[in-house]
Amino acid sequence: QTVFTYFHFAADRELTEAMIKSGAAAVAYETLADDQGRLPLLTPMSEVAGRMSVQEGAKYLERPQMGRGILLGGVPGVAPANILILGGGIVGANAAKIAAGFNANVAILDINMDRLRYLADVMPPNVDVLFSDRHIIREQLRLADLVIGAVLIPGAKAPRLIEREQLKE
């Protein structure tokens, strides 16, 4: 038996073990790459995830959700939200576009200089494109009202870039 689907094995050990135990052949769509290393089956899901991350984050900034009562775009006399996006791939770029469209102040961090150059060319003026390191993450985290994790390591679990204690600072 062969199963073709989005498995996300790296995030679900139980599922991984169950599939191994079943003896079925598993083809994880999210790991299928083309000749250039792109992930064409993951791209559409990533576009949606990036766009939805801003919508979902905005909800949790609202007071009824125990948020701080921050409106993404602000209002006259009140500054817009500061949004930190960790990762400048498909998810991060789509999140940045949506957040920028709401007139939020956006910082998108990545470690790939080619990707940063591309993002700097295509993003609107309210998006800062920065090289990611511990110092920059800590600095931007202090300013952020909303943080969106968008780092992808194909076939692996995303790295933990923020420690819980940093969220309390």
Predicted regions mapped to residue ranges:
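Glycine/serine-rich phosphate-binding loop and adjoining beta1-alpha1 elements at the start
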Residues: T2-N82
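Active-site glycine- and acidic-residue-rich loops that bind
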Residues: V127-V129, L152-L161
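Generic hydrophobic/aromatic pocket-lining and core-packing "Φ" positions
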Residues: T16, V54, A95-A96, L116, ...
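Short, acidic/turn-prone active-site loops that include or flank metal/cofactor-
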Residues: H8-A11, T31-A33, N112-M113, D133-H135, ...
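Hydrophobic alpha-helical scaffolding
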Residues: T5, T43, E47, V106-L109, ...
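Rossmann-fold NAD(P) dinucleotide-binding segment
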Residues: Q1-A10, R138-L146, A156-E169
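Glycine-rich phosphate/diphosphate-binding loop of Rossmann-like nucleotide-binding domains
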Residues: P64-G149
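Short amphipathic alpha-helical segments
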Residues: T16-E17, A96-I98, A120-D121, P159-E163
